[in-house]
Amino acid sequence: MTEVQLTILHTGTVLVDQALPYHRDTDPPLAWTHLLRPKSALVEIPVSCYLIENSHGLTLIDTGWHTDNRTRWGQIKNLRHQYPTNKANLPEGQAIHEQLEEHGIRPQDLDLVLMSHLYCDHADGLRLIKEAPRILVSEPELRAAQKDRIRYLPSQWKGVNLQTYAWNSRVGERQAYDPYGDGSVMMVFAPGHSPGLAATLVRGTETVVGVKPGVIGDDLRKYILLTSNVGFGRPSFEERLRPGVVTDAKAAFSSLDWACAAGADPRCIAMYANHDPEVEAGTRSLV
């Protein structure tokens, strides 16, 4: 059996109001912006990227913060109107290209870069790995980013050959993109937080027999689920808390319910949310 390796890379942290990752009905309007809120409402959470190594080579999911954020002025210039809401912390050695270099990998060695979505803490590092041969995001996500200059910062992918993919498969009833044609890596349409958000299924080769299709469908292989920002951490899934920032609240709850069901499936060996402070960096293996 071929071993699949998933390496979780923490590319710094982001300081946000606790209402941004976890929306509660008791939150005041726009609480996620931290407007008129106490410092005690702030939380610092990791910003994650994922390196997948399988028979198809090296696949990177998301890119984290850019090194511009290492100075206060550089960060203000880079994040612009989003700076008051999202404050980046990127220690030396934690930018995506620096961590890849530690693993002996150059951006041009990557076979594929897949973006879960294009919000600032996920897309900011695109310029650091622009030499990668293929960088893809879902078509609805790029379309939204080209129109919405409040939620997105197109300067973050200036000079990057960012291309789109179309849904070409399904995971259960959800549309999905299968870049390699064998279901080993699947980008699953999970909108709500953003219009084109995609979670990621990383499959091994071991199977679970006798399992019902459920929300994942009839593929029997074990998998790791990367929820991206469908949920931010344990409270998301245990208390059914959608993100504070959404473009479609109903869709966000639907995607969250799907992730909960997918995470509870007997084929799922682990589920990781991008900003979960309980998830440690490092390499996981599945066969």
Give residue ranges: language-model regions.
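Metallo-beta-lactamase
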Residues: 1-105, 109-121, 128, 134-189, 209-211, 222-229, ...
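Cap/insert and terminal regions of metallo-dependent hydrolase folds
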Residues: 67, 82-98, 205-287
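Metal-dependent catalytic neighborhoods of phosphoester/phosphodiester hydrolases
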Residues: 124-131, 282-286
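Active-site metal-binding loops of divalent metal-dependent hydrolases
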Residues: 11-13, 63-66, 118, 141, ...
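Core dinuclear metal-dependent hydrolase active-site scaffold
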Residues: 5-8, 42, 49-53, 59, ...
